[in-house]
């Protein structure tokens, strides 16, 4: 298992595979115990955009970013996950929990932890509404 002190967004080994939920999904390559931090914001890997920065981009780039970004409910900035965390699919019964996004407790963002033990080969799922203001407005 990777050490928590390491600079990264995803703190567990994962792989991308076709998902029964939607398109590609993020799957655990190792056992992840309940409570383990799976993801955290890293300003060296992730990018933040405000609405005017997105609007200034070509339409194709805007579409790509709006697909993969989440809108932080506290800062109202769009966050693009620079690694495969952006392939976490939505579930109303996720195996992860998102902590601190409304308060911006971790570098202005939150963290994602395992809500229960996650087995190798299991898809890592999150509830977009717990950290994405657009999803709270019904845009999932």
Predicted regions and their residues:
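Catalytic core of the SET domain in histone-lysine N-methyltransferases
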Residues: 2-19, 60-134
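Short aromatic-glycine motifs in intrinsically disordered, low-complexity regions
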Residues: 18-27
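Residue-level "contact hotspot" at macromolecular interaction interfaces
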Residues: 25, 31, 116-119
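Catalytic strand-loop segment that frames the active site of acyl-thioester-processing enzymes
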Residues: 33-34, 38, 46-48
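Intrinsically disordered, low-complexity proline/glycine-rich segments
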Residues: 42-43, 77
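Short, compositionally biased
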Residues: 46-62, 135-140
């Amino acid at each position: 298992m990777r050490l928590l002190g390491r600079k990264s967004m995803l703190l567990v080994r994962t792989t991308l595979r076709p998902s029964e939920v939607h398109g590609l999904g993020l799957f655990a390559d190792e056992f992840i115990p309940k409570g383990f931090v799976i993801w955290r914001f890293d300003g060296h890997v992730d990018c933040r955009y405000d609405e005017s920065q997105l609007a200034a981009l070509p339409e194709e780039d805007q579409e790509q970013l709006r697909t993969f970004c989440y809108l932080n409910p506290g800062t109202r900035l769009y966050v693009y996950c620079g690694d495969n965390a952006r392939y976490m699919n939505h579930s109303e019964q996720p195996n992860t929990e998102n902590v601190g996004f409304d308060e911006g407790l971790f570098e202005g963002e939150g963290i994602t932890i395992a809500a229960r033990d996650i087995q190798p080969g299991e898809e890592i799922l999150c509830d977009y509404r717990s950290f994405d203001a657009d999803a709270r407005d019904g845009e999932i």
